[in-house]
Amino acid sequence: MVKLLGGEIEKADLLRKIGRIEQVAGARPVKLASGKAEGIKAWEIYNGSGLEFCVMESKCLDLLYAKYRGVNLSFLAKPGAVAPEYFNVHGMEFGRYFHGGMLYTCGLGNIGQSCVDEDTEYNWHGRISQTPAENTGINAEWNGDEYLISVKGDMHEAAHSHEHLVLKRKISTRLGAKSFTICDTVENQGFKREAIMLLYHINFGYPLLDRNTRVVLPTSITENYVNYTKSDEQAFRHITDPVDGSSCDTYFHRPATDASGYTSVAIINDDLRLGVYLRYLRKDFPFMVEWKNMVSGDYALALEPCTQYPLNRMSKEAQKNMQFLDCLLYTSDAADD
């Protein structure tokens, strides 16, 4: 039986009611064609449950947006979608090409502010998000009574005489599902040990994000990034209206787990009777950053599972928690969004 729209239907009966499966679920290849987004290749994926999301082949297989039954879930920053050729490694230019989106991948050489390590300049939140996917593939087919949709690709963060790190990503969903899964593997294809930093910038926006939206985050330790003091729970859990001329808050969490070692965090809008949750193994991402931006025009909330806090690779905190790859050492079954 196929589970669809809260009910069940025989596969044969479903096929009797449609001409092609793309009538209810599929992956449409698209190419953006205006402004700084011109040339971005992407797939628009929809699975019949009302869940839709856009995966950008030209930008790390990151997600430009996600919607559920027509309701936007994600944040789109002021620059909008920006093609990789506008990427600028220098200084404070990050805000000129940061699209936000449902997922913006940060790393692999740096997360946090820009810095210089020996002869290498590292930009704010790293290069990987601006890296086009290679060896890409889309697969949409029946497996018994399940219609499965997936997209995959490889992103190479590499330089002559320097690192060769490869992020292998697969994003998958199925007909009728209210979720998708991101499975990432990072490989060191070079011949020397490399530091690795990884953060998933998962960005929520209006109308899911609105006054009185709740953040559900089981945490053992929470600190305010500005002064490293223990934060009032209400401060990071409660969403307000946008405030003109205000500033954002950033909180550092050590999330709690269930008996299986998984962490689950969520954002819930009771007025819309709608929420989104992330579930992942804490051993893969021991830290969580919450970016709460109640600023008018930049109104967003990001939940950011990460390998260490985003204080750039040269900070003492990052050095203390740095992970290294000698070969294929780091794998992750990432969040269900």
Feature names for model-found ranges:
Residues 1-92, 261-284, 332:
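Beta-strand-rich N-terminal accessory domains
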Residues 1-23, 85-156:
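An extended acidic
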Residues 45-59, 68, 155-202:
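Acidic, contiguous internal or C-terminal segments within carbohydrate-active enzymes
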Residues 73, 202-209:
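Short edge-strand/loop segments of extracellular domains
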Residues 110-113, 206, 210-282:
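Active-site/ligand-binding surface loops and adjacent short beta/alpha elements
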Residues 169-172, 320-324:
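Beta-strand-rich interaction surfaces with strong enrichment in secreted/lumenal proteins
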Residues 310-317:
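Short, structured beta-strand/loop micro-motifs enriched in basic residues and often containing a Trp
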Residues 330-337:
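Conserved small/polar residues in nucleotide/adenosyl-binding loops
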